[in-house]
């Protein structure tokens, strides 16, 4: 398991919208793994499933397993029609004063059952998670965005 945190000069509501809308995720993905996601998949609850096209062209179904509006979201990716193999992406947001938010991004592969995925899972470093946080911060802190 690996995680990274940083403070972002934006409201938790604004940051959460960038995370909870899968169509926005390729804009801030620090792993350079996400190519696109169809619009209209805004995550609203545990049990939601959203699809994403990866940069290598494959499709992933992401199963939302944790959700608290404005504060917490986590999903487990899977190949279409398959059970998730056990790795999880989590985002936690905590207000840190007026229009500031502490954001923690975690990748947890401790329950990963597919041995073939372990090398790539272990290659996901805190630096890559920080890259996502930095890109997310750059978008959220843009003066043109409300929040």
Which residue stretches match the model-derived regions?
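Beta-strand secondary-structure signal
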Residues: 3-5, 49-51, 74, 90-92, ...
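Hydrophobic/aromatic beta-strand elements that line small-molecule binding cavities or substrate pockets
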Residues: 6, 60-66, 77, 87-95
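Hydrophobic ligand-binding cavity/cleft-lining segments
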Residues: 1-41
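Glycine-rich portal/gate segments that line the openings of hydrophobic small-molecule binding cavities
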Residues: 36-82, 102, 138-147
């Amino acid at each position: 398991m690996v995680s990274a945190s940083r403070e972002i000069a934006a409201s938790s509501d604004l940051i959460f919208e960038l995370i909870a809308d899968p169509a926005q995720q390729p804009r801030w993905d620090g792993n350079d793994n996400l190519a696109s996601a169809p619009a209209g998949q805004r995550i609203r609850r545990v049990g939601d499933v959203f699809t994403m096209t990866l940069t290598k062209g494959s499709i992933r179904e992401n199963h939302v397993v944790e959700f608290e509006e404005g504060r917490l979201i986590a999903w487990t990716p899977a190949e279409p029609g398959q059970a998730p193999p056990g790795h999880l992406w989590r985002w936690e947001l905590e207000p840190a004063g007026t229009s500031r938010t502490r954001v923690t991004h975690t990748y947890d592969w401790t329950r990963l059952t597919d041995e073939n995925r372990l090398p790539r899972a272990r290659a996901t470093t805190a630096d890559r998670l920080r890259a996502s946080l930095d890109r997310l911060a750059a978008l959220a802190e843009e003066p043109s965005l409300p929040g």
